[in-house]
Amino acid sequence: MIELNKIYNEDCLEGMKAIQDNSIDLAVADPPYWKVIDEQWDYQWRTESDYVEWCVKWMKEVARVLRIGGTFYCFGYFRTLVLLIPYLESLGLELRQQIVIDKGMRVVSGRATRRYKMFPNVTESVLFIIKDNKKFVKPFLKERQEALGLTAKQINEALGVKSNGGGMWSIYTGNNVCEQFPTKELWDKLSHVLSFDCPYEKVAQTFNPQIGVTDVWSDINFYEEKHIHPTQKPLKLIRRLIKASSNEGDIVLDPFSGVGTTQVGCVQTKRNFIGFELNKEYYDKACKRIKMELAQPTLF
């Protein structure tokens, strides 16, 4: 049985099998980029297709454990991330946008960029993905309608809306090209009319807007923290993702925990976490960081 607020020293493909379906609110993944970092673990796939096949396997597990409407942030090198996008829909996932992080010119210092014959890469890419709740809502509502034997007209009347053109009911259960997900107010009404107990917070996307933050981030300093992992992400960056797409008490999954930055961010923001890290050295460092963070005094 998987425990909360713990990192496991094992392959995430095996470890995630112990996590229940639809139980994770947010997943943050920073997998190996493949032939980008000069480390053995970044060269363990012989071909591009081998790498993509492996990614689809762990992404399938993330999609399974992620709750309906849950968010999945995936870091990666743009060249390899684009190879994964075509598989998202088949996994029940929807790409919302790409977040670009400008690391500044310091990142190319000392590199022989001229021989690359391309513009110097000074960015990190993050795919902002959700588990598509629109695919869930239509069959769920239709199932409740059939169970209660109600007509569309009866449901619209109970909702207090007109039935012209199918009414409000057809927007969420009809054959609309532009699928929609109900507002909280309408969901609460539907739960009463159709007699179901499914909290809105467990099927709606969580997004907490942050003033002045767009899809291009240039305020993240990759050099102010001591690095104990070659692809370590700044705590400020991870905290921003956590706070944007989860609430206090939610469960955050990190399949590639590295040295525990996501977990430290969860402790600081009062989220629960589950993590996996295969490398024993990094795992030990992550556990040490988390222990130190938990020992810090809190103001509240």
Residue ranges and their predicted role:
Residues I2-G275, E281-Y283:
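Core catalytic lobe of class I
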Residues A286-C287:
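Conserved SAM-binding loop
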Residues L4, K291-F300:
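Positively charged, low-complexity nucleic-acid-binding target-recognition regions
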